[in-house]
UniProtKB/Swiss-Prot annotation:
Inducing factors: Down-regulated in kidneys from a strain of spontaneously hypertensive rats (SHR). Down-regulated after unilateral ureteral obstruction or unilateral nephrectomy.
Cell compartments where the protein resides: Mitochondrion
GO terms of molecular function: ATP binding; benzoate-CoA ligase activity; decanoate-CoA ligase activity; fatty acid ligase activity; fatty-acyl-CoA synthase activity; medium-chain fatty acid-CoA ligase activity; metal ion binding
Residues at which ATP binds: 221-229, 359-364, 446, 461, 557
Family statement drawn from the similarity comment of this UniProt entry: Belongs to the ATP-dependent AMP-binding enzyme family.
Enzyme class: ligase
Superkingdom to which the source organism belongs: Eukaryota
EC number(s) on file: 6.2.1.2, 6.2.1.25
One GO location term (cellular component): mitochondrion
UniProt keyword terms in alphabetical order: ATP-binding, Fatty acid metabolism, Ligase, Lipid metabolism, Magnesium, Metal-binding, Mitochondrion, Nucleotide-binding, Transit peptide
Protein name according to UniProt: Acyl-coenzyme A synthetase ACSM2, mitochondrial
Gene: Acsm2
Reactions catalysed according to its record: a medium-chain fatty acid + ATP + CoA = a medium-chain fatty acyl-CoA + AMP + diphosphate; benzoate + ATP + CoA = benzoyl-CoA + AMP + diphosphate; hexanoate + ATP + CoA = hexanoyl-CoA + AMP + diphosphate; butanoate + ATP + CoA = butanoyl-CoA + AMP + diphosphate
Entry keyword annotation includes ATP-binding: yes
């Protein structure tokens, strides 16, 4: 089943009409959108329809006033807000943004903050005010910030001490930027101080009645396939989608969820904002300026955290610790997203903790697309099944759906009915949006195979597939095999030019410390034989290069494309 869009005047996916065309629509002419027996309202705002809903239940004594947000840092400071408090303080935040800052509905606000409570307040404040928030990682440098501010025409930026110098270095070149709002205990020339303004702000605020399809957020894609693009999401594609699919977590009002993710990554707003709060679940946040596996393990051991969500790398780093020293009395669910979960990681985690890691799969443009929910069986190497309301298929080069067992391009059906959860399009770039459509499908950019149970097996990024002597090889399969060897800490597999086979498999390998002194030629042979022993021999890496680290995007994804481009330039 699909959500049926019956409002032809709403901004179209293919044309990517901009915000000013959206909120000037005559609201009275909008008809409800039907899906089954449910109704999607013409207007929706997560702050009022979700946060204020739970707050009203707390006020009426119909809900326990437990924490909605539980925050801590490494210095022993802790903060807890229930939904009533969160509702009130986020209203104050909205008044800061629209009052002291003078921002107006539709203005774009860059939010570059670490995992501090103010990130959640500012995001909710933007929603309440009809502002478009644009999260960004604090790892950005001045060139990254300049690109985002200029391309988005942002009117304001909210930032902390981590990036103020980077912002000030480029702000004079951003003609649309009018407000710089600082989240800090200190003042800085040219910046308004958020904390000082918040103290004097009124808790009375009337939430803007945003149209469901009105622009709510802009996320910059990670740039693994070119310069970052601005993926625009609506209040509908973020908030309403979360109300539909949050059941995959199996959470409830008495649970606590910890998502370890950079605030600039879409996984953060999905796993540490939308999905838990829809269910009334407490969100746990640890500042963690630098990831420390021992701190994570201690927190999991001593705090009532039921559910953990993080990238596979987090689980791999935790597995490098002595897990026998820790017990997790409350933890019952572990989820992973952002990159492929290696079967070896899944098996090791289960062996050492008794817990299975369930994979979620998606992208900036679609949010969560596939998942292995708590009620589904875990199949190593598989992403799970499509999440409601998505129809995900594997298609061929003509856009035809392939039968189970056949490899093709993973794609999401968007015609004739566009599902809720789909982004509005790439801002100011309708051609790029249209170029990603094949027939009735939006290409997810990955190769995969669908089995008879509807589970998807990830083969690799579309441009990562290696074709060697007619054999099509997914890099993740080789990476999975290499990661099973104790010498390998991290690896990336790409194609490398070869005069006979056209291209062959090459592995870049980061070694474990105890293997750094080993003879590299001998170790290469050992790893090659190991791969041959655990997967089809034709997949083994004919070339191996040992490196100290791998290139990554600012959100932590390995940039295979960068490795491949350099390899083909120097060896081709």
């Amino acid at each position: 089943m699909h959500w049926l869009w019956k409002i032809p005047r709403l901004c179209t996916f293919w044309g990517t009409e901009m915000f000013h065309r959206t909120f000037h629509m005559n609201i009275k002419k909008l008809m409800p959108i039907q899906w089954g027996h449910q109704e999607v309202p013409a207007k929706f705002n997560f702050a009022s329809d979700v946060i204020d809903h739970w707050a009203s239940l707390e006020k009426a004594g119909k809900r326990s006033p437990g924490p909605a947000l539980w925050w801590m840092n490494g210095s022993g400071e802790e903060l807890k807000w229930n939904f009533r408090e969160l509702s009130e303080i986020s209203k104050q935040t909205a008044n800061v943004l629209t009052g002291a800052c003078g921002l107006q509905r539709g203005d774009r606000v860059a939010v570059v903050l670490p995992r501090v409570p103010e990130w959640w307040l500012v995001t909710l404040g933007c929603m309440r005010s009809g502002l478009v928030f644009m999260p960004g990682t604090t790892q950005m440098k001045s060139t990254d910030i300049l690109y985002r501010l200029q391309s988005s025409k942002a009117r304001a930026i909210v930032a902390g001490d981590e990036v103020v110098q980077e912002v000030d270095a480029v702000a004079p070149d951003c003609s649309f930027l009018k407000i710089k709002l600082l989240v800090s205990e200190k003042n800085r020339e040219g910046w308004l101080n958020f904390k000082a303004l918040l103290k004097d702000a009124s808790p009375i605020h009337q939430c803007v009645e945003t149209v469901s399809q009105e622009s709510a957020a802009i996320y910059f894609t990670s740039g693994t396939s070119g310069p970052p693009k601005m993926a625009e999401h609506s209040h509908c594609s973020l908030g309403l989608k979360a109300k539909m699919d949050a059941g995959w977590t199996g959470l409830g009002p008495s649970d606590t969820m910890w998502t370890i993710s950079d605030t600039g990554w879409i996984l953060n707003i999905l796993g540490s904002f939308l999905e838990p709060w829809v269910l009334g679940t407490c969100i746990f946040v640890h500042l963690l300026p630098k990831f420390d596996p021992q701190t994570v393990l201690k927190v999991l051991s001593s705090y009532p955290i039921n559910t953990l969500l993080g990238a596979p790398l987090i689980y791999r780093m935790l597995l490098q610790q002595d897990l026998s020293s820790y017990k997790f009395p409350h933890l019952h669910s572990c989820f992973s997203g952002g990159e492929t979960l290696l079967p070896e990681t899944l098996e090791s985690w289960k062996a050492k903790t008794g817990l299975e890691i369930r994979e979620i799969y998606g992208q900036t443009e679609t949010g969560i697309t596939c998942r292995v929910s708590r009620t589904m069986k875990v199949k190593p190497g598989y992403l799970g099944t499509a999440i409601v309301p998505y129809d995900v298929q594997v298609i061929d080069e003509q856009g035809n759906v392939l039968p189970p067992g056949k490899e093709g391009d993973m794609a999401l059906r968007v015609k004739p009915i566009r599902p809720i959860g789909m982004f509005s399009g790439y801002v100011d770039n309708p051609k790029k949006t249209q170029a990603n459509i094949r027939g009735d499908f939006w290409l997810l950019g990955d190769r995969g195979i669908k089995d008879t149970e509807g589970y998807f097996h990830f083969m690799g990024r579309t441009d990562d597939i290696i074709n060697s002597s007619g054999y099509r090889i997914g890099p993740s399969e080789v990476e999975n095999a290499l990661m099973e060897h104790p010498a390998v800490v991290e690896t990336a597999v790409i194609s490398s030019p070869d005069p006979i086979r056209r291209e062959v498999v090459k592995a870049f390998v980061v070694l474990a410390p105890e293997f750094l002194s080993h003879d590299q030629d001998q170790l290469t042979k050992v790893l090659q034989e190991h791969v041959k022993s655990v997967t089809a021999p034709y997949k083994y890496p004919r070339k191996v290069e040992f490196v100290l680290d791998l290139p990554k995007t600012i959100t932590g994804k390995i940039e295979r494309a960068k490795l491949r481009a350099k390899e083909w330039k120097t060896s081709g």
